[in-house]
Regions:
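Alpha-helix N-cap/helix-initiation sites
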Residues: 16, 20, 34, 57, ...
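Membrane interface segments of multi-pass transport proteins and intramembrane proteases
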Residues: 95-98
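A metal-dependent, Asp-based hydrolase signature
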Residues: 42-90, 100, 104-107
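Asp-based, Mg2+/Mn2+-dependent phosphohydrolase catalytic module
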Residues: 1-3, 103-107, 111-114, 119-251
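An amphipathic alpha-helix signature
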Residues: 20-28, 61-65, 121
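Short, surface-exposed acidic
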Residues: 31-42, 72-83, 135-136, 167
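Active-site neighborhood of HAD-like aspartate-dependent phosphohydrolases
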Residues: 1-46
Length: 251
């Protein structure tokens, strides 16, 4: 049985500020009382530690959520704005780019590669083609509803691939700890944390500021999942199969 590699999209496979700024602009269009949101998000992306209100934001999307909630924007409007912004990627990808060496890293792995994203399907094919990975993803799960939807999704993958009794054969890779890593840890899966802003929100088997820094560890896991988990134990006091709950995105 091949191991299963679960990959996040935004902030993990897809870098660049255009999508999140498009999301902020869509909120401003739908809710004029949120004027100034995009400018504040741009400032956060330029200097993540400058705004005390956003010290816990792990990426631009969480910054948008926190700021828009403060401005009185409700979840339904945010979700609508998000869907509009993702559809616009079919027209303009802006500065979106793949991490260095992504296609080569994925192509050499003997693993079932699953993309799991909160994004809708609209605009996704164009985006994956632009990133050079359209033919390197074996399965796509959209509208995943992370964080709440991640655990049942992972349980399904473990069952579907016959590895429920050996969950270390599934590696979850992502940049939002509550969304991609906490649910995986609860199930005993392997984890790789792309901690872009060095927030250190929770434990993981391996952690780095960028995905390319994690390529060697991902290759190591794909070759020998059980040995990988033994070689990269979780921090003392954090046994596998537990996680501290933290709210994630509502999109």
């Amino acid at each position: 049985m091949r191991p299963v590699l679960v990959l996040d999209l935004d902030g993990t496979l897809a870098l660049g500020d255009a999508p999140v700024l498009g999301y902020a602009r869509a909120i401003e269009t739908l809710a004029p009382y949120a004027d100034g949101l995009t400018a504040t998000v741009e400032a956060f992306l330029a200097e993540p530690g400058a705004d005390a209100r956003l010290r816990n934001a792990q990426d631009g999307y969480q910054a948008v959520q926190m700021l828009s909630e403060e401005l009185g924007v409700d979840g339904a409007l945010r979700n609508h704005a998000y869907a509009l912004s993702r559809a616009s990627l079919d027209v303009d990808l802006g500065d979106v780019r793949a991490p260095s060496g992504l296609a080569a890293a994925l192509s050499e792995l003997d693993a079932h590669r699953v993309l799991v994203t909160n994004s809708p399907r609209d605009g996704l094919d164009t985006l994956l083609g632009h990133l050079g990975v359209a033919d390197l993803v074996d399965e796509i799960r959209t509208d995943a509803g992370k964080p709440r939807g991640m655990r049942p999704l992972l349980v399904g993958l473990l069952d579907d691939h016959g590895i429920a009794a050996d969950p270390a054969r599934l590696l979850s890779v992502g940049d939002i700890w509550a969304n991609e890593l906490a649910p995986a840890l609860e199930l005993g899966c392997a984890t790789a944390y792309v901690d872009t802003f060095d927030r250190q929100q929770g434990p993981a088997h391996v952690r780095a500021r960028t995905l390319p820094e994690l390529y060697p560890a991902i290759r190591e896991w794909a070759r020998h999942p059980a040995e990988f988990v033994r070689a990269h134990p979780l921090p003392a006091g954090v046994p596998a199969g537990t996680a501290t709950e933290r709210p994630g995105l509502d999109i």
